Amino acid sequence: MIVVSLTVSPVKNAEGQIVGASKIARDITEQKRSQEQIATLAREAEHRSKNLLATVQATVRLSQSETPDGLKRAIEGRIQSLANVHSLFVQTRWVGADLSTIATQELAPYSEKDRRHVRIDGPPVLLEPDVAQTVAITLHELATNAAKYGALAVPDGEVELKWHDADGRLNLRWTESNGPKVREPAHKGFGGRVIEQMIAQRSGTIHFDWRADGLICEIILKV
């Protein structure tokens, strides 16, 4: 089967009146075939990455006798976060993922019941895969921490995530309010060390302000 692109343009006389039509047919069979091949490869890549992540999750679950339940759930949550953002890459043929979609995806478990508890505000920003994965894991860790000890752990707690990009830098600000009193932990947890390392690898910075009325986390990343 041949795929044809047809363009029709009006033909006008000297007075500007339409007296006919010009039709141009182009054979775009190869172009269409290439697009379908790319789409197939993208779906296959998604399938393989999901299988790999599923295998890792299964391995963690099988280590039940050796791995504490809390650690196991934490690892599974991070793996699921990566799987979610990988699904977004397929939609853009691995160009990247939209920041708003990542944020909505990561915070959905905490905002579905009562959307006033979570506010997301920022312009459209397409993040390349490496940066998108870093942001996804970071938001996952912040949300998990807030659900355990912060604003998302109490009925009236609120979280606001805002961002803007300028001069090749993405600035994110995570603000918790109306939650339980918090203070800076004596020791950094594994999750905190993970996101600090990931952000540093992207030549970015992260700052935690442990206010009594709620955590403020500010992140700067090159995009």
Where are these regions (language model features)?
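Conserved short strand/loop->alpha-helix "switch" segment adjacent to the catalytic nucleotide/phosphoryl-transfer site
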Residues: 36-42, 111-157, 186
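Short beta-to-alpha transition helix within the HATPase_c
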Residues: 73-80, 84, 88, 95-112, ...
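Sensory coupling linkers of modular signal transduction proteins
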Residues: 15, 26-41, 45
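ATP phosphate-binding glycine-rich loop and adjacent ATP-lid/helix-beta elements
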Residues: 181-209
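Short acidic helix/loop segment immediately C-terminal to the autophosphorylated histidine
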Residues: 60-72, 93
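PAS-family sensory domains
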Residues: 7-9, 17-27
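Short beta-strand/loop element within the Bergerat-fold HATPase_c
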Residues: 156-168
